[in-house]
């Protein structure tokens, strides 16, 4: 199918709000979610596979009579975006190259440096690639209800996560203990393997040493 025809039908779907389910008590309800993309760069072919599978299921359920809700969120929290902005502010060549390449996926060359300069602020990285992902998913023809778009950085979502932790703590299902963790002095924050360059390859481990005092 040529791009003109694709765009024609994508615009028709959007105008008719065909993927925004209305209340229908005569239909069974079906909610599908797919893990949200992390918004620190452009998408790759693996994303295409993941979200195409979700879309196939959503469409199949629609044609078999279900009232389907297929929303989409964006993962904007966590230290990788903060670290990327920090590396950009520090002028790290690898970070500059990575973002330049990713921006070039969506922008003409004359716009790249202007956009790159804004990305010293983490929120600008997250928001730019969230918007870019919407365009990618729309061009793929995914049957997502964009009226319910949200991010993990939204106030209501942060409040919901906080409520979950406090609720579980009050029920005695989670508790805080002292335990060795990965920690970044630069960010003054705990980090996971995904936050560390080659963290899944060059693993940090706890070493134990026994000392013997000779008298």
What is each PLM-predicted segment?
Residues 1-215:
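N-terminal, positively charged nucleic-acid-binding surface of large information/translation enzymes
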């Amino acid at each position: 199918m040529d791009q003109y025809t694709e765009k024609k039908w994508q615009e028709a779907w959007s105008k008719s709000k065909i993927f925004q389910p209305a209340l229908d008590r005569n239909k069974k309800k079906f909610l599908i979610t797919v893990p949200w993309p992390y918004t620190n760069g452009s998408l790759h072919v693996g994303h295409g596979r993941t979200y195409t599978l979700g879309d196939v299921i959503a469409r199949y359920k629609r044609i078999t009579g279900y009232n389907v809700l297929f929303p989409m969120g964006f993962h904007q929290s966590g230290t990788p975006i903060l670290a990327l902005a920090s590396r950009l502010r520090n002028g790290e060549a690898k970070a500059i190259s990575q973002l330049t390449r990713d921006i070039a996926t969506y922008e003409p060359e004359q716009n790249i440096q202007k956009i790159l300069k804004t990305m010293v602020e983490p929120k600008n990285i997250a928001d730019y690639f969230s918007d870019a992902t919407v365009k990618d998913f729309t061009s793929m023809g995914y049957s997502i209800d964009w009226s319910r778009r949200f991010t993990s950085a939204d106030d209501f979502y942060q409040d919901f996560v906080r409520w979950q932790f406090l609720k579980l703590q009050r029920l005695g299902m989670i508790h805080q203990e002292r335990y060795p963790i990965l920690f970044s002095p630069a960010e003054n924050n705990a980090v996971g393997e995904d936050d560390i360059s080659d963290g899944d390859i060059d693993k940090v481990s706890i070493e134990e040493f026994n000392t013997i005092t000779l008298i």
